[in-house]
């Protein structure tokens, strides 16, 4: 039996139009985390990546890269990585410490991130003054004293031991899991420091850290 062609009067009606496949694939949002350190920071963020990948791999994708470089050089290497990558990174997070690097380089890196940012790719300067261990310590306490980076280790160990969580040592692989229950406290304490440091350059914001911006962005997936 031959099939009759549709009537002209029926053409254009909604029930005559082909159905669209509602199962359209949505590409995940790509993030690149580039750190100055090659072990402590990548280990911490790799654990975050594992946690996110377990449930949200199709919604957000993290690439982690520890460069072993600092401030301006770290920024330049991140820009090159973005240009060479097949992925279109929506967010590029530069994680770096003040340590003993010149103040002008530290502050200039923040300025470079702002200047390089576009609607397509946003560069975020996730600095800590003096070091990322400040972010770790803020999970347990609010700290306003400007300590040398070497003084954070014993303080972290004291806080960890008081909670039967062992001691702190560089490149401890379970730091994210250990700190995770106190994440909201760390975010609150970091925001308080940011308010105190209002009007100061990053190099003068001691202590201070921007890690909470990255964690707050990823928190819905953790």
Regions found by a protein language model. Give the residues of each.
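Short hydrophobic beta-strand that contains or immediately precedes a catalytic carboxylate
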Residues: 33-36
């Amino acid at each position: 039996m031959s099939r009759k062609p549709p009537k002209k009067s029926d053409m254009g009606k909604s029930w005559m139009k082909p159905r669209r496949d509602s199962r359209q694939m949505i590409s995940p949002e790509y993030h690149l985390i580039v750190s100055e350190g090659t072990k402590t920071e990548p280990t911490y963020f790799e654990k975050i990546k594992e946690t996110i990948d377990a449930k949200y791999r199709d919604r957000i994708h993290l690439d982690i890269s520890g460069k072993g470089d600092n401030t301006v050089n770290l920024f330049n290497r991140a820009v090159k990585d973005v240009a060479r990558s097949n992925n279109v990174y929506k967010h590029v997070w530069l994680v770096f410490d003040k340590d003993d690097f010149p103040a002008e380089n530290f502050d200039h890196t923040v300025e470079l991130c702002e200047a390089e940012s576009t609607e397509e790719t946003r560069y975020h300067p996730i600095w800590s003054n003096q070091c990322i261990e400040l972010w770790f310590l803020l999970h347990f306490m609010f700290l306003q004293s400007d300590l040398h980076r070497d003084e954070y280790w014993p303080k972290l160990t004291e806080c960890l031991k008081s909670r039967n969580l062992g001691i702190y040592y560089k490149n401890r692989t379970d730091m994210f899991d250990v700190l995770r229950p106190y994440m909201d406290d760390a975010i609150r304490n970091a925001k308080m420091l940011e308010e105190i440091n209002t009007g100061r350059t990053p190099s003068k914001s001691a202590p201070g850290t921007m890690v909470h911006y990255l964690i707050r962005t990823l928190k819905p997936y953790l």
